Amino acid sequence: MIKFALALTLCLAGASLSLAQHNPQWWGNRNTIVHLFEWKWSDIAEECETFLAPRGFAGVQVSPVNENIISAGRPWWERYQPISYKLTTRSGNEEEFADMVRRCNDVGIRIYVDVLLNHMSGDFDGVAVGTAGTEAEPSKKSFPGVPYSAQDFHPSCEITDWNDRFQVQQCELVGLKDLNQHSDYVRSKLIEFLDHLIELGVAGFRVDAAKHMAAEDLEYIYGSLSNLNIEHGFPHNARPFIFQEVIDHGHETVSREEYNGLGAVTEFRFSEEIGNAFRGNNALKWLQSWGTDWGFLSSEQALTFVDNHDNQRDMGSVLNYKSPRQYKMATAFHLAYPYGISRVMSSFAFDDHDTPPPQDAQENIISPEFDDDGACVNGWICEHRWRQIYAMVGFKNAVRDTQLSEWWDNGDNQISFCRGNKGFLAVNNNQYDLSQELNTCLPAGEYCDVISGSLIDGACTGKSVTVNEHGYGYIHIGSDDFDGVLALHVNAKV
């Protein structure tokens, strides 16, 4: 009986930890993360204070913080090839990182770090030098900045069969030296690295290449981490939010279900299917059952996105900033529909897969610059600063804890729905106008469409909709309108 009680206690403790690791630790009613891809720490700090907090964002996913290899031309993916766990990259040093985390936490914006636990850098001719000046010999699996040596890695092999669990989890992903996370020493170095970031005030981690590590090894590492730092406003005993990159299109040998008990999982099927729908390859009417009926993870386990820094560079169904009208419609639906833990992308312009972030002649990352409307102009795309996207972050905050109701569609690509009595969204992806009296579910009054304009000093700069005492309003979205979506909510009442 004593043994049974002990086993039950340990089981319940593990379950409690895993549930805690699904909690993003957001402030108040905020509930959207933005990935400020390749931004400098000083620029993120200022963005938290001047833009993200006032617009109601909840958190920022930042690029990898640890020292990385220096590759010719400085492609973005060099950040995913670690040399050491020193906090020096082209985004800044440890002091600048700590200052950014503190300043963002002070205004209610949580920081989530993209962490690389699976591997170190790939082969390099001779001695490689990292962004902190540390030398390493990747071909010999020698990384004195940690230190790691050959005994800390799995034997070298190539992934040739993605249906072979051994290859997927113990061979080298695109030639990157594969760490042995079952080693007590390797575990201790990874835990030390993550705990240092927790001490500096981060709220959690995006775990890169999680499916290439055994779930039981990650469970040990996550369970050994410190609680979040109460000096940064986290409650006592709060656990870091974990969201894990697991690409699973179905029927995979290593599946997302092995990881979703440990934390949230990136729901790549969401990204692919929302792209299919808004590219016109699947009628929007089918989105009424969006979520688990589509084979997605449960809402609290799914990190959802229209695109991410990887798949936006691939050809296929995934939408990106280069198809702005469809992208804004898809993002509006993403943030309006009650499913998933939402993340929006903030990109830089790219012409090919390897395009580096905007940089000067000395290969220093440059700060984003803004026009009079607040949009980025110097190589940064900054989708999160598009009115149609940040306004939907406000919409998502306004309708939090409400359910979907009053779904309407025309049997094709025109849809609308309510979020309780607090919000209404309509989308037209047909080649003809949507002109219809629809139930908005809102209290009577005049509302500003936050897609086409903003509510400023009590006046709407875009379209407005008058809602009658029965909750109905006349909705018009022309097929040639600049945006194919309209959104109303209680905080945008004129």
Curated annotation (Swiss-Prot):
Its EC number is 3.2.1.1. The record marks D310 as: Transition state stabilizer. Ca(2+) binds at N118, Q169, D178, H212. Coiled coil: none annotated. SMART domains: Aamy, Aamy_C. It is an enzyme of class 3 (hydrolase). This is Alpha-amylase-related protein. It comes from Drosophila kikkawai.
